[in-house]
């Protein structure tokens, strides 16, 4: 896709220019509002550093959570401003609003190399409005912060599948460029979508089958094997006639799973054993069981060791691997071994078989960090779960398509 990039903007010169950057800082916070995974913040740094060092007056936009169009302190970007200041080694100011008086005063007062973070763009209901006129009005107010000779850099890959004001509409009003992160993400996904080296193995987990139907349909023609674990595997197992007891089940998707197994049964690889739990609790009683031996009233929260071994054998010969979604409830240590085992098998294939491996953002990327695995063991860890899935499904990403215009 022919889009102008950050390099093009830097070549044109940014010294003294206001540059508005859309980043993805939708990071997890604990009850004390401390960031528990800085992955997305770390990924944003190269673009912000390059602009700051080039002398730009940088204004950063981002959202956090779903504040539903109103100011809610719980979703303030204050922890992000603090983390950015620490990681960049320079003070990043946080505006008290998005396009209000404080944002304008601070934007006007920026000097070369300064970085200003606007408050959560979703505090303004127009950010996610379905009304184009409302979004356009908000985009005009955002663009006004850049004064004359401004520019827009799209660097939040985790949001490019959303046609929202700070991602899409603002790009119509300012010269626009793909940031380094978005450029890298698209080139990686293009490689997987257009010319994956065989054998190509896709690993899908996560809770809902309904979220992954499109990607299974799209990738079944290209992938050699599709490994299915996580919460979504229980609907497949139920479709095969297994009693999954209280495990996560999308009853309304059983027929769809039956159809997928009928069409792609030679490619879909399912677990052969499970880790059952007496309840959904980190301290629950647990036991390793075969597919029809989950005790009555219990639920499965992870794939079992034989499944890890089987999946590992499939992955060991792969030359291209795309992984999206954990194999179990990795947040509970007792039910994290399936995810750890699959991640390690992917790392081993990357090193030992020279496979090109992509972790498709979201919970899979979080699990790599939570479990303390070597992030450098994968070829690429994406920052966008939903965006990467939609791209591989063949859907247009509005926030990328607009950059080509």
UniProtKB/Swiss-Prot annotation:
Binding-site residues, ATP: 212, 331, 361-364
Keywords recorded for this protein, A-Z: ATP-binding, Cytoplasm, Glycolysis, Kinase, Nucleotide-binding, Transferase
Organism expressing this protein natively: Corynebacterium glutamicum (strain R)
Location(s) in or outside the cell: Cytoplasm
GO MF terms held by the record: ADP binding; ATP binding; phosphoglycerate kinase activity
GO cellular component, one term: cytosol
Subunit (UniProt): Monomer.
Record-listed E.C. numbers: 2.7.2.3
GO biological process: gluconeogenesis; glycolytic process
Keyword Nucleotidyltransferase: no
Protein name (database record): Phosphoglycerate kinase
Reactions catalysed: (2R)-3-phosphoglycerate + ATP = (2R)-3-phospho-glyceroyl phosphate + ADP
CDD domains, per database record: Phosphoglycerate_kinase
Chief place where the protein resides: cytoplasm
Pathway info: Carbohydrate degradation; glycolysis; pyruvate from D-glyceraldehyde 3-phosphate: step 2/5
Binding site for substrate: 24-26, 40, 63-66, 122, 162
One Pfam family named in its UniProt record: PGK
Matches recorded under InterPro entries: Phosphoglycerate_kinase (IPR001576), Phosphoglycerate_kinase_CS (IPR015911), Phosphoglycerate_kinase_N (IPR015824), Phosphoglycerate_kinase_sf (IPR036043)
């Amino acid at each position: 896709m022919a889009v102008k990039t950050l390099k093009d903007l830097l070549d044109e010169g940014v010294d003294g220019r206001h540059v508005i950057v859309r980043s993805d800082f939708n990071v997890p916070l604990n009850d004390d509002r401390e960031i528990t995974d800085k992955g997305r913040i770390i990924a944003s740094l190269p673009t912000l550093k390059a602009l700051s060092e080039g002398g730009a007056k940088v204004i950063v936009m981002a959202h956090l959570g779903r504040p539903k169009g109103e100011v809610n302190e719980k979703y303030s970007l204050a922890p992000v401003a603090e983390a950015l200041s620490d990681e960049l080694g320079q003070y990043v100011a946080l505006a008290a609003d998005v396009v209000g008086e404080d944002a304008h005063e601070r934007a006007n007062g920026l000097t070369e190399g300064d970085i200003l973070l606007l408050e959560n763009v979703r505090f303004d209901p127009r950010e996610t409005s379905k009304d184009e006129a409302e979004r356009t009005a908000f985009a005009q107010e955002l663009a006004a912060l850049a004064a004359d000779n401004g520019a827009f850099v799209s660097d939040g890959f985790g949001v490019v599948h959303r046609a929202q004001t700070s991602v899409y509409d603002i790009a119509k009003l300012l010269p626009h460029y793909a940031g380094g992160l978005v450029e890298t993400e698209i080139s990686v996904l293009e490689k997987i979508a257009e010319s994956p080296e065989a054998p190509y193995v896709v690993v899908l987990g996560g809770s809902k089958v309904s979220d992954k139907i499109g990607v299974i349909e799209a990738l079944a023609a290209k992938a050699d094997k599709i490994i299915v674990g996580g919460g979504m595997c229980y609907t497949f197992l139920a479709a095969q006639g297994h009693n999954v007891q209280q495990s996560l089940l999308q009853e309304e998707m059983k027929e769809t799973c039956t159809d997928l197994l009928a069409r792609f049964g030679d490619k879909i690889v399912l677990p052969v054993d499970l880790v059952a739990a007496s309840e959904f609790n980190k301290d629950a009683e647990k036991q390793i069981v075969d597919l029809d031996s989950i005790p009555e009233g219990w639920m499965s929260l992870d794939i079992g060791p034989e499944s890890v071994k089987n999946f590992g054998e499939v992955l060991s010969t792969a030359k291209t691997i795309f992984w999206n979604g954990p194999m179990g409830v990795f947040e509970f240590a007792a039910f994290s071994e399936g995810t750890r085992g699959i991640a390690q098998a992917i790392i081993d294939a990357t090193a030992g078989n020279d496979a090109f491996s992509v972790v498709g953002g979201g919970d899979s990327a979080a699990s790599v960090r939570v479990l303390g695995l070597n992030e450098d063991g994968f070829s690429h860890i994406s920052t966008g779960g939903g965006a990467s899935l939609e791209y591989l499904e063949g859907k247009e990403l509005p926030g990328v398509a607009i950059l080509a215009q």
